[in-house]
């Protein structure tokens, strides 16, 4: 559907931001038809109402939001450049892990873990319900925190009693937390200075044997290795939303170079990661401000 605004009343830039807002989405939901494939008629789309301020106010709103969009995109580019730097070092030190002549020892991922229970999926069903979430207590770590490298605070917590009941699903320093749904394979190492928490049902925990595999090396192998990425994509299922389970993840083949070489890479990556944390927090702040202004202007 093409939307061509009357620019004597509303600018296309202002209308575009409105159509990106949660308020617009909520208003559309009431007119959406279909279950598997949702759709909306042109008539219903045209009947969505919005408040239209003066052209001067519209211009001011667009300028503020445009500025924040530029900041957000700039921060994302910085993160990508830092990731590229780490990836270049990874390839320089370990080569192409998908190459047939790769010389490093291989193991199933479960063999690189400290125990048979090293790879764990978060609690399901009656083990943890949303009604048990608290506003403070022991953190429940979810996909959004993994996506930004644990630079944002959790949104759900548990009582100490409930967390003790779910101690088998704990997340401790050095654990690798991986998204098992949607953005499958996205992962982050749980920081040293964070209190222990519990993983959400959409999260997989990988607890490696530190005598053989360093967490940061393994995390970047999961991110950068074409061989690993291909395996994860191959075993991820779901027509609407991709997903991976524990048994499939356990049998992923990974490479295990000598620990001394892993240490050299980890030292380099840790320095770059310090810069990534600063940039990611700046990105989080800019995104929060953008979301807040969108709510303020279009709610």
Give names to the regions the model predicted.
Residues 1-20, 142, 163-223, 243-245:
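A short beta-sheet element
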């Amino acid at each position: 559907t093409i939307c061509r605004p009357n620019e004597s009343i509303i600018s296309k830039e202002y209308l575009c931001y409105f159509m990106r807002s949660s308020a617009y989405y909520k208003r559309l939901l009431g007119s959406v038809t279909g279950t598997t494939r949702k759709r909306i008629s042109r008539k219903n789309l045209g009947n969505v109402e919005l408040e239209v301020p003066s052209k001067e106010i519209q211009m001011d709103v667009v300028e503020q939001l445009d500025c924040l969009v530029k900041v957000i995109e700039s921060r994302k580019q910085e993160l990508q450049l830092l990731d590229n730097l780490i990836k270049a070092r990874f390839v320089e030190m370990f080569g192409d892990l998908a190459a047939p002549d790769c010389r490093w020892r291989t193991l199933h991922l479960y063999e690189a873990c400290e125990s048979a229970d090293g790879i764990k999926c978060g609690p399901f069903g009656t083990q943890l319900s949303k009604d048990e979430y608290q506003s403070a207590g022991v953190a429940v770590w979810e996909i959004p925190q993994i996506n930004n490298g644990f630079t944002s605070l959790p949104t759900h917590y548990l009582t100490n009693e409930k967390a003790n009941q779910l101690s088998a699903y704990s997340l401790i320093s050095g654990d690798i937390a991986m998204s098992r749904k949607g953005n499958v394979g996205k992962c982050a190492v749980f920081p040293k200075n964070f209190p222990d928490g519990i993983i959400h049902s959409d999260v997989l925990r990988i607890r490696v044997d530190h005598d053989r595999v360093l967490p940061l090396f393994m995390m970047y192998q999961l991110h950068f290795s074409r061989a690993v990425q291909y395996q994860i994509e191959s075993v991820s299922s779901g027509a609407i939303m991709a997903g991976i389970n524990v048994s499939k993840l356990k049998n992923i083949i990974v490479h295990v170079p000598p620990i001394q070489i892993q240490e050299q890479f980890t030292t380099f990556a840790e320095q770059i990661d310090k810069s990534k944390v600063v940039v990611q927090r700046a990105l989080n702040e800019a995104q929060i401000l953008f979301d807040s202004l969108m709510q303020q202007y279009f709610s």
